[in-house]
């Protein structure tokens, strides 16, 4: 009876919190207890929110997302995995300790192993997967770190397949790296399908059926389509989650939140606040339309092909706003301009491109000259007037000389005929 009352209290606490969070102002930063967090747009790879995203943290059972990814990439759902004796030594939560006793040598389908791993978070099943996929646990750890490197998780080092860190300080990752991992698992249909389940019926080949429930309390709430919880004393409460609303998909990660036992709501409140902020966040203008983002220095002949040379600085501009989500990350903006002919310059013709980048996000924009060929002509108008006057004088003098020569010739002929 007490458990039912506690469960109802937790449920209504979460519902109240999530409903209140939904109406929070879109332009206010989310309030979270977690010491490290991120929101990433999985379509564009833009970082919508960041808090200490490169700070190394213990990920606890979120580690199992990498274990799940390697299982999905190396086994089929119907493949059988053998339960090793060493798996019995893994700490709770373990299927063999907390759900139903398992005898070494018993087998699980890869499908049931995936369900137990991601829903129940079975530590012994993670060990079983490691030995069956890698041959040994150590070889599997090597596979985990190689995969992390391939995904661009440059601040990650795995030591265990389940995230237990009692005996090591070398098992770590970052919120940013876990967002990259979430992107990879979201792309895997098997894992994506598994994380959406609220519960699953599983069994070993020699054991009875058992129901394992999803420890992600947010599944199915306000667009939550999956996630992985985690907790150790070193890591604090952790949660990585996937959200989808109106076809828009976000990844959220919270590390180092509080485990407010027995209700255990804080990390879920943190995640809900992140999701609501992420779907309502507005970008801010980083560089405004028609603003100068750089300049190009070049030399040209004041009169095409001839005449003295002149050096000019050409402003490089954009014809649209460059907008980014407001975060504590520093954007980079680089421009690249092609070969320029000053006599064909137009403010409406692209002369190259600019690339704005924030961590793994990049977007290109066309760039334009801030001046046209007419501006160059106007800047040299006095020279052209002077040159024209000189030309007129020269032509006049030439014509005058020619006229004198012709007059002398006519006078000479007239004397001869007299």
Task: Walk through the language-model features, giving the residues of each.
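Sec-dependent N-terminal signal peptides of Gram-positive bacterial secreted proteins and lipoproteins
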Residues: 2-26, 383-404
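Structural motif marking the loop-to-transmembrane transition
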Residues: 2-4, 59, 106, 110, ...
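Generic "edge-of-domain/loop-turn" microfeature
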Residues: 6, 12-15, 19-21, 44, ...
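A short hydrophobic/aromatic micro-motif that marks alpha-helical segments and, especially, helix-coil
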Residues: 17-18, 78-79, 137, 203-204
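Active-site-adjacent loops and short helices of periplasmic peptidoglycan-processing enzymes
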Residues: 24-189
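Domain-terminus/edge residues, biased toward the C-terminal soluble/receptor-binding domains
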Residues: 153-157, 169-391, 396-416
